[in-house]
């Protein structure tokens, strides 16, 4: 008689995704980040739920309610710091996951990849509205600056901004709706994650060699369940160390000052995980151009599958494109650094060069090198 996990309608779905899933035998630790992102999402939803029980979405009491959580709620300080630093780890895993996809050609599974890009955008939106909730100086001014970018939309821009604000400035209506969005989005993300997995399991995972692994697969459980659990332990250990030893390392000191519409902070900047996109936005001395570049910096990922010129899938055996990939990694690191710097010489020029290089790598250099490698191997 067949086991219950193979016959029960619900358990069968879980079984096919987590137990009997045929998995390439040679997937490396770079394939761990999908499950780590799942862990991050669950951790963020749980800590967020407990924070929402004590938080008040009102400009008069929002800042005080966060202070109350940290001072008076049992382990409130821990829950709040886990949630804030959990977001940083979420983005670390996200960027590594995307980097893995770019390196090993996972983007050729187009549906999985495009849903992944939508997921990235959703997580970024969620993090943005979440950052506004403590109602500190950087929360308020970050919300003002970023929502104001929509005024660059021709004709309807100003109307759009006032519609999002719910008034003529970032005020109580804005905070209330941002809290509603911040509560809602993670559940939309969870639904999208299921779609992401559904499409992935249509094709199966790729593997480091980039060649078909149909003849060489092993069951997901126990091999990769334990491998994933090991990843969970490392991630939770790192998160615990950051949260317990230096919880405010990645935050902005300005956010310990309650929001004041009359005083602008000297340097308005987002959390570290948005700095690369912020640097690209600032590198164009035109509002609409900057907004378009900001959108393009993420949406360019959707174009990557269309610009794949190589006859090989990944970069494992493509040394020239490898150099360009690591140039891209270095470029994003430089953009992240520039995004946190004031708008003055030489940072402006460095930011502009890094921004041009960012788009050139995706649109010109990597596709051209793929084509050149085909020629060198006489594969055309």
From Swiss-Prot:
The UniProt annotation places heme b b566 binding at 97, 196
Return the CDD domains for the record: cytochrome_b_C, Cytochrome_b_N
InterPro entries membership? Cyt_b/b6_C, Cyt_b/b6_C_sf, Cyt_b/b6_N, Cytb/b6-like_sf, Cytochrome_b, Cytochrome_b_C_euk/bac, Cytochrome_b_N_euk/bac, Di-haem_cyt_TM
- Please list the residues that bind heme b b562: 83, 182
Cofactors that this protein relies on: heme b
| Subunit (UniProt) | The cytochrome bc1 complex contains 3 respiratory subunits (MT-CYB, CYC1 and UQCRFS1), 2 core proteins (UQCRC1 and UQCRC2) and probably 6 low-molecular weight proteins.
**What protein name does the entry list?**
Cytochrome b
Source organism per entry reads Allocyttus niger
């Amino acid at each position: 008689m067949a086991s219950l996990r193979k016959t029960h309608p619900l358990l069968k779905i879980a079984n096919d995704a987590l137990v009997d899933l045929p998995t390439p035998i040679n997937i490396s630790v770079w394939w761990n980040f999908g499950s780590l992102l799942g862990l991050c999402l669950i951790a963020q939803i749980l800590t967020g739920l407990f924070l929402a029980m004590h938080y008040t979405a009102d400009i008069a009491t929002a800042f005080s309610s966060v202070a109350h959580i940290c001072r008076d709620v049992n382990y409130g300080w821990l829950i709040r710091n886990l949630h804030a630093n959990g977001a940083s780890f979420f983005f670390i895993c996200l960027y590594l996951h995307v980097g893995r996809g770019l390196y090993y050609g996972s983007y050729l599974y187009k549906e999985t990849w495009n849903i992944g890009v939508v997921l990235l955008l959703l997580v970024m939106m969620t993090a943005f509205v979440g950052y506004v909730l403590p109602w500190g100086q950087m929360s308020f001014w970050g919300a003002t600056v970023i929502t104001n970018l929509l005024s660059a939309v021709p004709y309807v821009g100003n109307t759009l901004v006032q519609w999002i604000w719910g008034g003529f400035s970032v005020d109580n209506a804005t905070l209330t709706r941002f809290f509603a969005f911040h509560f809602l989005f993670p559940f939309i993300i969870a639904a999208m994650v299921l779609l992401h997995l559904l499409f992935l399991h249509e094709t199966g995972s790729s593997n480091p060699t980039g060649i078909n692994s149909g003849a060489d697969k092993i069951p997901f459980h126990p091999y990769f369940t334990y491998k994933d659990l090991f990843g969970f332990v490392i991630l939770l250990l790192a998160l615990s160390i950051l949260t317990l030893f230096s919880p405010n390392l990645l935050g902005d000191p300005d956010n310990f000052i309650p929001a004041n519409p009359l005083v602008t902070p000297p340097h308005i900047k987002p959390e570290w995980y948005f700095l690369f996109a912020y640097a690209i936005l600032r590198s164009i001395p035109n509002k609409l151009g900057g907004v378009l570049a900001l959108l393009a910096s993420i949406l360019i990922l959707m174009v990557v599958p269309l610009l794949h010129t190589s006859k090989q899938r990944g970069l494992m055996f493509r040394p020239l494109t490898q150099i360009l990939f690591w140039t891209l990694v270095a470029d994003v690191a430089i953009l992240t650094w520039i995004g946190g710097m004031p708008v003055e010489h030489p940072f402006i020029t460095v930011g502009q060069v890094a921004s041009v290089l960012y788009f050139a790598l995706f649109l010109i250099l990597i596709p051209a090198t793929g084509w050149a490698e085909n020629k060198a191997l006489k594969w055309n």
